[in-house]
Amino acid sequence: MTNKKTIYIWDGGVFSPPTKAVGKLAFNLATYISSKHDDKVNVEYHFVPTNKYYNKPWVRCVEEEDRLFMLKYLVEYINREYKVPSNIKFIVNDHDINYGKKTKDPSTTLTSLKYFTKKQMENVYLANSIDNVIQRVKGYWQDTLELFFKVRIICYDIYSPELIGVNQTENYIYKSINLVDLLQQEKHNYPVEFQQYFKKHKLSKDDINHFISSKKNEHKFEGLKKLIMSRLTFLPKHLVPEAYKAVAGNRVREELDVYYSSLKNIQDLTTPGIETYITDKGLYEHCKSKYVDKLISKSSKSRSKSRSNARSRTKSSAKSNAKTRSKSKSISKSRSNHKKTKRR
C-alpha cells in the first residue's frame, strides 16, 4: 500500500465458523468503499472476532485460537479467489480477544473502537447488517447516537424483497428510527451535530424534554432523522451475495453438531482450508447441546445472581403474603398485583 489516506472497515462478529459468503461480502464491502473514494485511498478490512466471554455456545465451545486460524484461512481464500486490488488489505484483528484476556468480559462496540486513534476514527466504517442497524435506530441498544457520530456505518441488506419490498432498505430504516428513545438514552449529552441542529431550530432543553415525554412539536425534530441517515452508507443490494443469510453460520454448525459424518454442506459453505481444519480437530461436535447453559461472562454471572436473588425475594414475599391473607380474611381479595413493566 502506498502512502495514501486509509479507510478502515471494522467487522466484528462471531465468525464461528467463517463462511465463503462472509468472504465474498467482505470483498464487496471493501471494493465498494474504495470505489466511493475513486479508488484513491487505502482500505483496511478488519475481521474482529468476539472473545470467549460473548454469551453464545458456538463461541464458548471453540477455542479463540481456532476461530483466529479459521479467519486467517478465510483471508487466504479471499486473496486467492478474488482479484484484490493492491490498495485493499484484509486483516484478522485479535483486539477483542486480547481485551477479554485482560478483563474476563465481552467488549462493547465503542470499547472495541478504542483500537483507533481519534484521527483514525474519522475514517472508520462499521460493517453492520440491516437487522443490526434497525435494532440500533429503534433504541434497543445503548449509545447508538454516540456510535453513529463517532464512526460511519456501512449497511448491507440481508432481507428478502418479499419482506421489505424492492429498493426499500433506506426507507425501511428511516421509518424505524425512534427519536424519543434515542434522545432519552443520551440524557442531553448529544453529538455536536444534534446540538447544532437544536441551536439552528431554536429548540431549548424544555422543548426536547416535552418532545421526549409527549412528542410535542414532533415535526421540528424530523430533521434529526436525516442527520442519522447521513451517517449510513448502503451497499447496493446486488453486491450482497445470494448465499449470504443470517443463518449461514448456523447451518454449518447444525451439520457439524448433528450430522458430523455428512460433509457436503460444510464443503459447500466453507473454504477448503476451513473445512479441513474443522473436521481434523472435530470442532463444533455437539456444541450447542454441551454449552448452551454455560455462562462465562462475570457480568452475566452478576446479572444471573441478581435475577436469582430477586426471584428468592419474590418467593419469600409471596409466601409471607399468603400467610397474611390466610390469617386476616378482612383483607380485600380484589387487591391487584403490582404492574410489571419492562423496557428492552
Predicted regions: what is each one?
Residues M1-K4, F198, C287-R344:
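Compositionally biased low-complexity segments enriched in polar/charged residues
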Residues M1-S299, R343-R344:
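Nucleotidyltransferase catalytic core that binds NTPs
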